[in-house]
Design a protein with these regions (language model features):
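Type III/flagellar secretion export determinants
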Residues: 1-162
Length: 162
């Protein structure tokens, strides 16, 4: 009795050249996506709210490869303008941390720059208001000092016996 065993051909167990190239491209993309999101996390620290979250594609080899990713960061202003300036700088640095920032990364960096500029404007306005209040107070003290001797006060006579 003869017996036969089936062995799959090498063509069916190995990927063809086109599939191998596709897998290699997916591996490179996966590596870049992970490095990109890790750069955000490394710089972001306490700004990171969630992530990384990845979108995957299944390659011809049946494995999943990350093809996109995101990290959610806190982009809200801080309690005060003075605290907002360094936070905005941190947000911008986090957004631009990857060596290849995406359009979304540039958009977040622009928002952070606007937040920083607004906070600096608020700080400058508060300083102007404080100086104006100090000048007004100084002028008031100066006027009071002028009248201290009584010589500059308008004359008034009071006759209690009239």
């Amino acid at each position: 009795q003869a017996s036969a065993t089936f062995t799959p051909s090498t063509a069916s167990t190995e990927l063809d050249t086109r599939d191998q190239q596709a897998v290699e491209a997916l591996r490179r993309i996966d590596q870049r996506v992970h490095q990109h999101e890790q750069a955000h996390i490394s710089v972001g620290g306490d700004l990171i709210l969630s992530g990384p979250n990845y979108a995957y594609e299944t390659g011809p080899d049946g494995k999943r490869y990350a093809v996109a990713g995101e990290v959610t960061i806190d982009t809200s202003p801080a309690r005060t303008p003075e605290d907002t300036v360094p936070k905005a700088q941190h947000i911008r640095a986090t957004a631009l941390a990857p060596s290849d920032p995406s359009p979304q990364d540039h958009s977040v960096a622009a928002i952070a720059s606007g937040m920083e500029a607004k906070a600096q404007q608020q700080i400058a306005m508060q300083a102007l208001e404080a100086r104006a209040a100090a000048r007004s107070e100084a002028n008031l003290y100066q006027k009071v000092a002028q009248y201290d001797g009584g010589s500059d006060l308008p004359a008034a006579s009071v006759n209690d016996f009239a």
